[in-house]
Curated annotation (Swiss-Prot):
The organism's taxonomic lineage, starting at the top: Eukaryota, Metazoa, Chordata, Craniata, Vertebrata
Keyword check for Glycoprotein: yes
Protein name in UniProt: Lipase member N
AB hydrolase-1 domain span: 81-381
Keywords: Disulfide bond, Glycoprotein, Hydrolase, Lipid degradation, Lipid metabolism, Secreted, Signal
Protein's gene: Lipn
């Protein structure tokens, strides 16, 4: 924790240092993607980009992006296999595009002949809209990953199916993105039938043994968390604060401090990270979520059970679930062919937690643990294209 406070304090002082004498050369060191959204990153790298809004059954308006084909495939005809990708907590869909094109899963899949779609979870920067509710209202933020699974994912998949004419697609999730998939596919068999294969990277199902400093937050009572963070959104985008962090971390002498901060959060291996892209990673997170989502994750913390959100009273639970206690998610009910990857140094999804869920996946077709990987390596690791992405494509060709 002292390292985190030092990071935050120093980062806040950096803008004054810059304005005082231009001691640090900020502008010349920033990657252009820092200022771009997902669509702009796609086009900047020479790929075709499409952007759509999807309205869920409960009224949330979600922004999704599409890369219909790779850079060198404009002459190819016929439908391409569809892939949908779901990001982690506090991220957005630029998450899949933040390394160079030859190291980003979104671009690699497009170049491999796939029709790539990437969603944004409700409440993040790009999906903070609703047909009737304002983001200033507490009711807008009354959701967790339960609603993302119940409404967001079915709505997006229906949209993709209607747009492409293809009835089935591949699903790739990382971290909380896997949670959304597991909940949806285990509770909605009709949706599960549309999934050719479920690729789960660093799956968050069991959350009993995390060692990240970040998870100490979940030791606090729910009332204290609400007192500190409020009852609406949490870690919403703050461009000024984010630029302070980016300025700080762009300095070569100070990058080790940023590495330490990220290591405390979710593990970090700078030898497997392109440190010149650190500003791009930080520019697109955090993007925000609901405090209710955080409380649902807290509910999993050090628990033996994987349940729907507890609304806090028998009456409220009865109103939402028609029973006095939130229902268990039954992973054994999920019949989708599934592949899982885990990291041996992952401090959020530890090997012990992964071991607890594997017996519950009744159609597990592939499992691999990389002993040296942490939670970020799945999306940012320099060796991810060779060790992970190539295997994903191989399995897609097998389960077509």
């Amino acid at each position: 924790m002292p390292m985190m406070w030092l990071f935050l304090t120093t980062a806040c002082l950096i803008p004054g240092t810059l304005s005082a004498g231009g001691f640090l050369d900020f502008e010349n060191k920033v990657n252009p993607e820092v200022w771009m959204n997902a669509s702009e990153i796609i086009m900047y790298n020479g790929y075709p980009s499409e952007e759509y809004d999807v309205t869920t059954a409960d009224g949330y308006i979600l922004a999704i992006n599409r890369i219909p084909h790779g850079r060198a495939q404009t002459g190819q005809t016929g439908p391409r296999p569809v892939v949908y990708m779901q990001h982690a907590l506090f991220a957005d869909n630029a998450y899949w595009l933040e390394n160079f094109a030859n190291g980003s899963l979104g671009f690699i899949l497009a170049d491999a002949g796939y029709d790539v779609w990437m969603g944004n979870s409700r409440g993040n920067t790009w999906s903070r809209r609703h047909k009737t509710l304002s983001a200033n209202e507490e009711k807008f933020w009354a959701f967790s990953f339960n609603e993302m699974a119940k409404y967001d994912l079915p709505g997006i998949i229906d949209f993709i199916v209607n747009k492409t004419g293809q009835e089935k697609l591949y699903f790739i999730g990382h971290s909380l993105g896997t949670t959304i998939g597991f909940v949806a596919f285990s509770t909605m068999p009709e949706l599960a039938q549309r999934i050719k294969m479920n690729f789960a990277l660093g799956p968050v199902i069991s959350f009993k043994y995390p060692t990240s400093v970040f998870t100490n937050l979940f030791l606090l009572p729910k009332s204290i968390i609400k007192l500190v963070f409020g009852t609406k959104g949490v870690l919403l985008e703050d461009k000024n604060a984010r630029m302070s962090f980016i300025t700080f971390c762009n300095q070569k002498l100070l990058q080790p401090l940023c590495s330490e901060f990220m290591s405390l959060w979710a593990g970090f291996n700078k030898k497997n990270m392109n440190m010149s892209r650190l500003d791009v990673y930080m520019a697109h997170a955090p993007t925000g979520s609901s405090i209710q989502n955080m409380l649902h994750i807290k509910q999993l913390y050090r628990s033996d059970e994987f349940r729907a959100y507890d609304w806090g009273s028998e009456a409220e639970n009865m109103n939402h679930y028609n029973q006095s206690y939130p229902p268990l998610y039954d992973l054994t009910a999920m019949k989708v062919p599934t592949a899982i990857w885990a990291g041996g140094h992952d401090v959020l999804v530890t090997p012990q937690d992964v071991a607890r869920i594997l017996p519950q996946i009744t159609n597990l077709r592939y499992f691999k643990q990389f002993p040296d990987w942490n939670h970020f390596d799945f999306v940012w690791g320099l060796d991810a294209p060779q060790r992970l992405y190539s295997k994903i494509i191989s399995l897609m060709k097998e389960y077509f």
